Amino acid sequence: VITANPNITVMFAPYDEFAKGVKIAVDEAGMSGQVSIYSADISTADIAAMREPGSAWKATAATNPAVVGEVSVRALAMLMAGEDPGAQVIVPPTLITQQQLNDGNITNMEELAAKLPAFAHADVAAPDWMPLPSAPSQN
């Protein structure tokens, strides 16, 4: 796709594993300077790929898997207490940019959660009677 369409300037990958493949293709085509990659989802390996010098992978929107689990347990607790968490419980994604990762010297998921509070917590499925976890300390 990339070599057949040399005027491509932006690629979107709806999943981080797809973004890894797009990045490899862009790198192999020597087009890292002209193509910007945007995606959804993140992992420690993705952070490393985004932070590579000259990386075309510019940003991703993601939710923290630990927070998704936390919210799921809270929604279950609400159901067990006879409360309705709603038909959908949506954990808002966080925009994570290459610049944030580089400026914050973020190299893994733990550092990402510590340095981007929006990635570390979600105020959904949180009734008044349920204590929320403490926000991680910022380093």
Language-model regions, residue ranges each:
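Hydrophobic alpha-helical
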Residues: 1-49
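Generic structural signal for alpha-helix termini and adjacent loop/cap motifs
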Residues: 4, 53, 79-83
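Short, glycine/charged-enriched secondary-structure capping and boundary segments
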Residues: 25-28, 52-55, 75, 110
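Short, charged, surface-exposed secondary-structure boundary motifs
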Residues: 46-50, 69-72
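Short beta-strand elements at the ligand-binding edges of bilobed clamshell
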Residues: 52-66
